[in-house]
């Protein structure tokens, strides 16, 4: 799975975190492992231009998704085909997202993770134009985001235990005599 991030926003954003959440969602949604995703972070003016050009709506927005192939929600796992080689592009506007994060009372990092999940789901064919679609998509979005956070906590716990074990074993000399 290849995920490329291009930060043209002028803001300091954790690209590895965006890649992590995108990779998690793509894997959890059973997208073929050869799939590729491109993410671009832009400033408000660029996002406003894209928003008018593609959605005919004024002003910037938080996230836009540009799928390469039309996919049906939930259609990927049962598909006999290996899946698209390129899922598409996600465009994020960190400055717009920062305002949303402030209003929601959480961090910009959390907002960008949420928007990344949202963008990937759009690439996979999910939408929220109708109330039932919105309920399904936002429920899945929140569930995936929470699963990703739990996965990060698990990884942190395992790393802390491994570090503790390394210190304990290193002090007793067990590690020094073991072939690696």
From Swiss-Prot:
Residue sites binding Zn(2+) per the record: 118, 122, 128
Name the UniProt record assigns to this protein: Endoribonuclease YbeY
Gene3D superfamilies in alphabetical order: Metalloproteases ('zincins'), catalytic domain
Keyword Transferase: no
Enzyme Commission number: 3.1.-.-
The protein's required cofactors: Zn(2+)
GO molecular function, one term: metalloendopeptidase activity
Superkingdom per UniProt: Bacteria
UniProt-listed HAMAP family: Endoribonucl_YbeY
One annotated GO biological process: rRNA processing
Family note: Belongs to the endoribonuclease YbeY family.
Pfam families, per database record: YbeY (PF02130)
Job of this protein: Single strand-specific metallo-endoribonuclease involved in late-stage 70S ribosome quality control and in maturation of the 3' terminus of the 16S rRNA.
Cofactor note: Binds 1 zinc ion.
Record SUPFAM superfamilies: Metalloproteases ('zincins'), catalytic domain (SSF55486)
Top enzyme category: hydrolase
Keywords on record: Cytoplasm, Endonuclease, Hydrolase, Metal-binding, Nuclease, Ribosome biogenesis, rRNA processing, Zinc
InterPro entries: MetalPrtase_cat_dom_sf_prd (IPR023091), YbeY (IPR002036), YbeY_CS (IPR020549)
Keyword rRNA processing recorded: yes
PROSITE patterns on file: UPF0054 (PS01306)
GO cellular component: cytoplasm
Subcellular compartments: Cytoplasm
